[in-house]
Amino acid sequence: MEAFAQNLAKMVEEGGKAVAAYMRPREEGKPDDMTDDIADALKTIGEVANYWMSDPKRSFEAQSRLMMGYMGVWAGALQKLSGEKAEPIAKADPKDGRFKDPEWESPFFDALKQTYLVTSNWAESMVKEAEGLDPHTKHKAEFLVRQLSNAVAPSNFLMTNPELIRETLSSSGENLVRGMKNLAEDLVEGKGDLKIRQTDMSAFEVGRNLALSPGKVIFETELMQLIQYAPSTPSVKKTPVLIVPPWINKFYILDLTPEKSLIKWMVDQGLTVFVISWVNPDARLADKGFDDYMRDGIFAALDAVEKATGEHQAHTIGYCVGGTLLAVTLAYMAATGDDRVASSTFLTTQIDFTHAGDLKVFVDEAQLSVIERRMKEMGYLEGRKMADAFNMLRSNDLIWPYVVNNYLKGKQPFPFDLLFWNADSTRMPAANHSYYLRNCYLQNNIAKGLAEIAGVKIDMGKVTIPVYSLATREDHIAPPNSAYIGAGLLGGPVRFVLAGSGHIAGVVNPPVKHKYQYWTGGPTGGDYDVWLKGAQEHKGSWWPDWAQWFSALHPDEVPAREPGGSAFNPIEDAPGRYVREKS
């Protein structure tokens, strides 16, 4: 008990440091961003509650349903206590790692678990069955209830998690001292906001053990650096490849390690690969919009690619929002008679945002006005804001396990390159991000043919070059039906391919791993589910399928090219300095 008392005192001391770290920026006048978010959430949940509470009969029915569930849990607990076998009223998903500890099957903790599951299932059903809500409000309410349900799980609290109780008793509370220390450090790192560590950030460094493919930065603007990768084959395909990654994350997800690198694999296939590395913008770039990213990003890169290789045309690859910008750029080029792009590959790219997934819950006029107000004050959207939004999409994987591990078990997270990249967030210029949210998520103007860029109306039907469009089956950011509908807007031949897994793992899937699968089928157009029903499944990675499609376009080869050619003196080694800039 003496050791426990000493550790309790240490925990209180570390807790004081955590409170001080949280309060410091607020005492200095930093606005609390949570106020607007909480008000919006309460308004949304209030609309659901109003439906059930406005009619006494409905209200009684809802309460009775919940009470019946609790009575079933109570009856089952009594059966267990008397030594009888009881069938659970509510079962956790077999894949749910929160309740894997055997102690969750004991009468007390099983009743606690089932009470939680009954309550969360009931709350979700209240939203699902509420009538008279517009689709966006219902979608947002479902998302918010899911977030709340995930947050209040008994596995997230010391006194209701049997594993944490054992850990605390066996270590005399040392886990809580370490956990409070971790909490204070993360609040300091987040400058008063909680920046949950998902991995050991000291284990990785871009350019040291990540983003290692050899190459040179041959050209740069204030928005991007252009990297040309060194060849690994004596000859290469005549027409070069330009990759346009997202600026919401950093490009090295495509070059994490040599074993996982799509960039290295393409180079080894005999391609001359160029990649745009976007700048991590600050307030000086606040007014840079979508058209600037087109001109000083893609167009400037195409000019440099032509000078470096002598080739007028290039094949392009766009990933996520980089693909959306590329699609808009291709429509602009089609309208202005610019033929510098020979083909395009879209990786988990949305052009039509009708079914854009859970990210849509963050975008309506009220929320967007708040975001734009914050961006106007700073000149950009903080990288942490987007990182938090992405983590909330999978909070049971990317938030709460780390809360338990870091702050209640007092452990350090394991080194994991993917999660290092996930935490290496970037800022977004105010003008660019506002255009993207309004024209894509809020108004869907690109798909409707109402969007303009640099004074030109965008018509995706004018894009007639060959296209390879990849979606991933479990994508929560760019859902496959959304990518499918967008691909159907294009005016040329489209090979639509569906890969297994999600937004990252489905794309970065080296063939040597023999993981997942992909599906191929007929042309786009019509219903996605009909396409999927008729699609053929193939084992393994989609990369070889893409290589076969790509090779048929321009099979001619030339001697391998060194980065920059005779036109450019390399500025620095890949991956360059832009990608190293922290948010």
UniProtKB/Swiss-Prot annotation:
<dbReference type="GO" id="GO:0016746">
    <property type="term" value="F:acyltransferase activity"/>
</dbReference>
<dbReference type="Pfam" id="PF07167">
    <property type="entry name" value="PhaC_N"/>
</dbReference>
<protein>
    <recommendedName>
        <fullName>Poly(3-hydroxyalkanoate) polymerase subunit PhaC</fullName>
        <ecNumber>2.3.1.-</ecNumber>
    </recommendedName>
</protein>
<dbReference type="Pfam" id="PF00561">
    <property type="entry name" value="Abhydrolase_1"/>
</dbReference>
<dbReference type="GO" id="GO:0005737">
    <property type="term" value="C:cytoplasm"/>
</dbReference>
<feature type="domain" description="AB hydrolase-1">
    <location>
        <begin position="300"/>
        <end position="508"/>
    </location>
</feature>
<keyword id="KW-0583">PHB biosynthesis</keyword>
<dbReference type="InterPro" id="IPR010941">
    <property type="entry name" value="PhaC_N"/>
</dbReference>
<keyword id="KW-0808">Transferase</keyword>
<dbReference type="InterPro" id="IPR051321">
    <property type="entry name" value="PHA/PHB_synthase"/>
</dbReference>
<feature type="active site">
    <location>
        <position position="320"/>
    </location>
</feature>
<comment type="function">
    <text>Polymerizes D(-)-3-hydroxybutyryl-CoA to create PHB which consists of thousands of hydroxybutyrate molecules linked end to end. PHB serves as an intracellular energy reserve material when cells grow under conditions of nutrient limitation.</text>
</comment>
<keyword id="KW-0012">Acyltransferase</keyword>
<comment type="similarity">
    <text>Belongs to the PHA/PHB synthase family. Type I PhaC subfamily.</text>
</comment>
<comment type="pathway">
    <text>Biopolymer metabolism; poly-(R)-3-hydroxybutanoate biosynthesis.</text>
</comment>
<dbReference type="InterPro" id="IPR010963">
    <property type="entry name" value="PHA_synth_I"/>
</dbReference>
<keyword id="KW-0963">Cytoplasm</keyword>
<feature type="compositionally biased region" description="Basic and acidic residues">
    <location>
        <begin position="574"/>
        <end position="583"/>
    </location>
</feature>
<dbReference type="InterPro" id="IPR000073">
    <property type="entry name" value="AB_hydrolase_1"/>
</dbReference>
<feature type="region of interest" description="Disordered">
    <location>
        <begin position="560"/>
        <end position="583"/>
    </location>
</feature>
<dbReference type="InterPro" id="IPR029058">
    <property type="entry name" value="AB_hydrolase_fold"/>
</dbReference>
<dbReference type="GO" id="GO:0042619">
    <property type="term" value="P:poly-hydroxybutyrate biosynthetic process"/>
</dbReference>
